[in-house]
């Protein structure tokens, strides 16, 4: 029987870098990013600050978020993160660490913005219709992710990846301007002031989208 060769050291190093596996607090974008950084994580924080459309009501949004959580990598508990509940998330992680008697790995994933390929706005902006769908940068999700990283650091969970540290720096450096930046963002312009105000007024409670489950 032919012996299965171990992957070259260079490949192993590249995989470790892409997965941020040596860090306790990790950060990436979209479901693809979640697939990369969720290995070994105990909590996955899905950051999604603003609704997808101005007509999406609270019930539809919860249903969509829970459906999405079911598609995320098996294993970690999945909680929703936004600009108001970073402290609740940090509290959950510290409780889980106490229960485990060991550190918890936290994967923070920003949803980003998604545009329907080939729609009128995309065409007018010069975007090709055949570009694969991937999350665009969303300032509101970056700042909320940074708020979670900052809240974790406040309770001593601060072994962060460079990606997570950069998100944290964005939040702490722009803390006084967060509401203005979100209200003036690309996503906010598509939703309208009332929808954005409601999102920014979201309560501080922990929202669990999926309990932890065994990895396949």
Where are these regions (language model features)?
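Acidic/Gly/His-enriched mid-domain segments of enzyme catalytic cores or analogous surface patches
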Residues: 42, 51-116, 120-124, 128-134
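Residue-level detector of intrinsically disordered, flexible termini
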Residues: 9, 15-16, 27, 121-128, ...
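An anion-binding catalytic pocket shared by soluble metabolic enzymes
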Residues: 2-32, 37-38, 42-43, 54-82, ...
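An almost-null, non-specific background feature
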Residues: 34-38, 50-59, 98, 115-117, ...
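Active-site flanking residues adjacent to catalytic metal/cofactor-binding acidic residues
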Residues: 47
């Amino acid at each position: 029987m032919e012996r299965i060769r171990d992957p070259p050291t260079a490949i192993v190093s590249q995989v470790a870098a892409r997965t941020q596996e040596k860090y306790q607090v990790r950060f990436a974008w979209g479901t693809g990013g979640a697939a990369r950084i969720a290995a070994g994580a105990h909590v996955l924080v899905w950051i999604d600050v603003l609704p997808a459309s101005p007509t999406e009501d609270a019930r539809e949004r919860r249903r969509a978020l829970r459906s999405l959580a079911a598609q995320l990598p098996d294993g970690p508990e999945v909680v929703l993160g936004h600009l108001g509940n970073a402290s609740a998330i940090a509290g959950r992680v510290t409780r889980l660490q106490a229960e485990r008697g060991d550190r918890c790995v936290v994967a923070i994933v920003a949803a980003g913005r998604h545009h329907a390929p080939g729609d009128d706005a995309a065409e007018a902006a010069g975007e090709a219709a055949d570009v694969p769908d991937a999350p665009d940068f969303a300032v509101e999700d970056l700042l909320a992710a940074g708020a979670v990283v900052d809240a974790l650091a406040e309770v001593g969970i601060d072994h962060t990846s460079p990606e997570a540290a950069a998100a944290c720096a964005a939040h702490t450096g722009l803390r006084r301007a967060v509401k203005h930046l979100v209200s003036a963002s690309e996503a906010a312009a598509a939703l309208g002031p009332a929808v954005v105000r409601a999102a920014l007024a979201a309560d501080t409670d922990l929202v669990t989208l999926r309990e932890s489950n065994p990895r396949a």
